[in-house]
Amino acid sequence: MDKRMFQNKPVSLLGYGCMRFPTREENGERRIDRAEAEKLLDCAYAAGVNYYDTAYGYHGGESEQFLGEAMKKYPRESFYFATKLPIWMMQDDGPERMEEIFSDQLRRLQTDYIDFYLLHGVDADGFETVKRLGAYDFIRQKQAEGKVRHVGISFHDTPEVLEKILDTYAFDFVQIQLNYLDWTMQNAKRQYELLEERGIPCVVMEPVRGGALASLDKDAAAVLKQARPQDSVASWAMRFVASLPGVLTILSGMTTMDQLQDNLCTLSGFSPLSDADRDTLETAIGIFRKNGIIPCTGCWYCMDCPVGVQIPDNFSRYNIYTVTKDE
């Protein structure tokens, strides 16, 4: 597994995103299939993946606890935990709630420190909440206490908002949504440039846009397969992101062993995109964008809907129909 350096620490180019573990039905609810998910984590660890990204609310709050249990068999200093303070859940809470959540996260993860701690899902409104709660001072205080090693932000908004935040607070790293579709569609290019200009390492989420860039439609996929028959469609998305020198690690929410093995193959002995590869990818993107898909990653941050609409499910069905033409 390729590594990139962060403050003299080797960080795996592939990071394990712990929001999309395999699940199974249990008492009418979808719960993490712990046996299958642990196999994935064990395989990733054995292959050199050392960055594990979770959050307070992932898998209905089950992700952190499962991750802590699954990783306790390994030396704590051999891997990094990344988790997040859920700013978006704290609109009506006071500062004391941050302490409760942080203590709960340490307990769930079975650790006395968190390597990478982020303010979660911050947009323009969340930025105001951060200021009101004193959340930035809180995470820096935890860093001073030795309970957090590095502080960052998980960002969801425009480059203009990101620039305002970076002008206000200093972060050790920043996590953004970046992939070859959002490079222009959501101006991830400018967000990345802002970080590069300031020398801030970039952690990437949604490199395959919730799985949409792992399949594309048959015409766009055919362009990529013709150019590199041995490579998966998803590998093009991972290589696009990994070709950016300011990227520290690429988070992928791997649900199956095939997905994990494909990413391991792509990012072990990584080969950057050539000029010819970029031309091929641009052709495929042009074909794919003509389909008129809805740019939804399936993150579920829009839920719950006040009138009960299953928004991500409906978007997913629409996109599948649009891409496959109901074949």
Q: Predicted regions span which residues?
A:
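N-terminal binding-site loop/beta-alpha segment at the start of enzyme catalytic domains
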Residues: 1-79
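Alpha-helix-loop-beta-strand connector modules within alpha/beta enzyme cores
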Residues: 64-83, 136-146, 197
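Structured C-terminal cap/extension of enzyme domains
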Residues: 45, 50, 69, 168, ...
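A short, structured active-site edge motif that brings together acidic residues
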Residues: 77-90, 119-120
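Glycine/proline-rich, positively charged
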Residues: 24-25, 32, 90-208, 215-222, ...
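Conserved, mostly hydrophobic/aromatic
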Residues: 14-16, 44, 52, 67, ...
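Short beta->alpha linker loops
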Residues: 58, 62, 156-157, 255
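Short catalytic-loop micro-motif centered on adjacent basic/acidic residues
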Residues: 51-57, 149-153, 175-176, 249-251
